[in-house]
Amino acid sequence: MIGYVTIGTTDMEKAKAFYSQLLEPLGAKVIMDIGRIAFIGSGMDQPMLAVCVPYDESDPAPGNGNMLAFPAGSREDVDKLYAKAIELGATDEGEPGERMPTFYGGYFRDPDGNKAVFYQMG
């Protein structure tokens, strides 16, 4: 249903490095890079994350109420991936834990301030 989600960045090289290293355990890598925008994922036929310098050249701004959500595979993987995000320069928005019955997640903001979560349902 979702082809890709785009987030803005002020530093393409830093954003590509952050997300390709962070999402590598999930099988993701930079699969297309055309300078101003790069797509990170496991294949062109799978959902992707795109990082880009805004087309209008204005500063990117994280949205209020927007969040990237990455399925981690297990609670242990949530813990590992959250820790890796922090190690790569993300800031904490909520350490891994159970948020409601059947939902376990760890929240962070990437170096550009975009909010994200690694989660496990069930």
Regions found by a protein language model. Give the residues of each.
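Charge-dense, helix-prone N-terminal extensions
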Residues: 21, 25, 29, 71, ...
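Long, continuous compositionally biased terminal/linker segments
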Residues: 40-80
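Vicinal oxygen chelate
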Residues: 86-122
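Short beta-strand micro-motifs in enzyme catalytic cores
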Residues: 38, 66, 102-106
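Core segments of cupin and vicinal oxygen chelate
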Residues: 7-48
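N-terminal beta-strand motif that seeds the catalytic metal site of vicinal oxygen chelate
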Residues: 1-16, 68, 121-122
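Short glycine-enriched loop/turn motifs at secondary-structure junctions
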Residues: 1, 61-64, 100
